[in-house]
């Protein structure tokens, strides 16, 4: 090889190496989630991203804030495109994660689950909603998502308003209704409520679970039998009755869950039935009264589950980086951080939790899960149920749908 050939080869190699370095330096890690910025999990995940940046200084991190509704309505389209991120928060359940898993749009994580020690953080109970069969039904099949938190629906209540009238936390449905009536007699609408989004179904399903046993929950969530509508009929009758008595405002049909949360946090309503994702907001914004939570009185089941999951799209360009990020989210430091911000962390060290809200929520979640009382969510069984339940519940509140018509729509 003559000198000119050697020079040409050397120059060519240099160009290739330079291109490779430039490509490595320009690698972009795309991550999405829909948790509101002030929630404990979002704050903790943001800190995990900062740690990620220090561990991967050659990677550009591109975070995008999404909404729950965006991914609920367009998840399949996004995941089935070249615009999918490397990792994203996704809702669990047959109708959401199950649907896209059955379409082959998610990366199986079983190998990473064991290799990276995630099985030491998450037990079988924590991962039952991470597995979906070929039909998209939860409980078996490959692991396609990793939860990093728990969540449940409870009754947020204004301690000051309760104490001013000598009221105790209700322990039965009858006592709960008596509390509603007490406030209404004082001219106060007792329940903050919104039917425009997922808040519509939380109260509805909570009331249905007052009439549910193990068989009903398993049949409903696992599509094991035709729908027994009796618990939903009871729930629909209660909501219609509570609207007629003024326990729920008819104006709720114009409110989102965040609007209803603002009604509670501003002190206008003494109670709000919603999920633990409100804790960060309430801890930061409620300054004029004391507040807490209690589990709605049911025989066993509470609306809730392990939280939303991080999934890795089949089309993700940087899967190893996605796994590294999940490592950080599941780390003891990040889980403790989440708990001490008031979150329901799955892998936190109880001895390390000093935050009052975080400690309460971890304890309540343990109380529910230890008795096998996680009833999941009503929109999970089949795709399209989310929108159907919102429309049908809105009809109950505005009077355009009777309880009997409501349950007919669910079949």
Regions of interest found by a model, annotated:
Residues 95-152:
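Hinge/lid segment of periplasmic solute-binding proteins
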Residues 180-183, 221-252:
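Glycine-centered hinge/linker elements that transmit conformational signals in sensory
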Residues 54-55, 81, 141, 245, ...:
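Extracytoplasmic/periplasmic substrate-recognition and gating elements
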